[in-house]
């Protein structure tokens, strides 16, 4: 990929990018991709496609409930770095 900020164009990635932006906010997503190195950019693509383009697309849980579960899991695991962004996401989802 010659342009570091060019994103894959497949539907799963694009749906994941839209959901990730909806939940986490544009600034969070922009920062995640802007801060990615050549080594970590594939991981950002994977997270966007697998987590946000697959798991977060399922309609068995609404976004508010899914966010609250995520916050609870991250809290229990002591993952404070990830928790900060997901608390903002939960607030974006009405929690």
Question: What are the residue ranges of the model-derived segments?
Answer:
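Mid-chain, well-packed structural core segment of small domains
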Residues: 71, 76-95
């Amino acid at each position: 990929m010659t342009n570091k900020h060019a994103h894959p164009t497949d539907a799963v990635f694009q749906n994941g990018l839209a959901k990730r932006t909806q939940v986490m906010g544009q600034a969070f997503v922009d920062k995640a991709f802007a801060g990615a190195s050549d080594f970590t950019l594939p991981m950002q693509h994977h997270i966007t496609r697998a987590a946000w383009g697959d798991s977060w697309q399922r309609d068995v849980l609404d976004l508010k409930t899914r966010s609250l579960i995520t916050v609870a899991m991250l809290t229990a695991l002591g993952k404070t770095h990830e928790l900060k962004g997901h608390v903002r996401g939960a607030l974006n989802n009405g929690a």
